[in-house]
Amino acid sequence: MKRERINPDTLELDERVVLINRVSKVVKGGRRFSFSTVVVVGDGKGHVGIGMGKAAEVPDAIRKGAEAAKRNLIRVPLVHSTIPHEIVTKFAATKVMLRPAAPGTGVIAGRGVRPVVEAAGIKDLLSKVYGSNNPVNVVKATFKALSEMTSLQEMARRRDMTPQELNARRMRRETTEAA
């Protein structure tokens, strides 16, 4: 399935720096330091992108990361203020579980998951990170999970139901679990 290109110029994107890491290269004269960054951009209305930048100076690395993130935008299907369904995704040694939450719950997430889901505009979400909690891999696993998310309409079409039937069924299941 080919991903549609999203034009970042049509969106009001906010940048968030998730990680700034100083890395060194050992050369004959000593160590050469450079910086790598992970940047998340999003409009808070269902669009989010992640990017990595590397440069000799921090501002240049952040700028490169932001440019990469704008080239890597995806659309995330939202249901009210949460995601349409639970998803578990693995990236490298990191496994991320994202679950929809009731309105008012807030974003219950760690340092790598929170900036990605908040940039996408998700207000209510439960998450858990299993395995490696390396921030780069957590951000990439979260982004992968959001990119694999399917909309309520798509899920209903696959099951030969209307979105209203599917949502009613889901609500019944959630109320019986709460009781």
Curated annotation (Swiss-Prot):
Stored InterPro entries: Ribosomal_Su5_D2-typ_SF (IPR020568), Ribosomal_uS5 (IPR000851), Ribosomal_uS5_bac-type (IPR005712), Ribosomal_uS5_C (IPR005324), Ribosomal_uS5_N (IPR013810), Ribosomal_uS5_N_CS (IPR018192), Ribsml_uS5_D2-typ_fold_subgr (IPR014721)
Annotated S5 DRBM domain residues: 13-76
Role: With S4 and S12 plays an important role in translational accuracy. Located at the back of the 30S subunit body where it stabilizes the conformation of the head with respect to the body.
Domain notes for this protein: The N-terminal domain interacts with the head of the 30S subunit; the C-terminal domain interacts with the body and contacts protein S4. The interaction surface between S4 and S5 is involved in control of translational fidelity.
Gene: rpsE
GO terms, biological process: translation
Gene Ontology terms, MF aspect: rRNA binding; structural constituent of ribosome
UniProtKB keywords: Ribonucleoprotein, Ribosomal protein, RNA-binding, rRNA-binding
Stated name of the protein: Small ribosomal subunit protein uS5
Lineage of producing organism: Bacteria, Bacillati, Chloroflexota, Chloroflexia, Chloroflexales
SUPFAM superfamilies from the UniProt entry: dsRNA-binding domain-like, Ribosomal protein S5 domain 2-like
Statement: the UniProt record of this protein carries the keyword Cytoplasm: no
Family affiliation: Belongs to the universal ribosomal protein uS5 family.
Subunit structure: Part of the 30S ribosomal subunit. Contacts proteins S4 and S8.
Segments for region (Disordered): 160-179
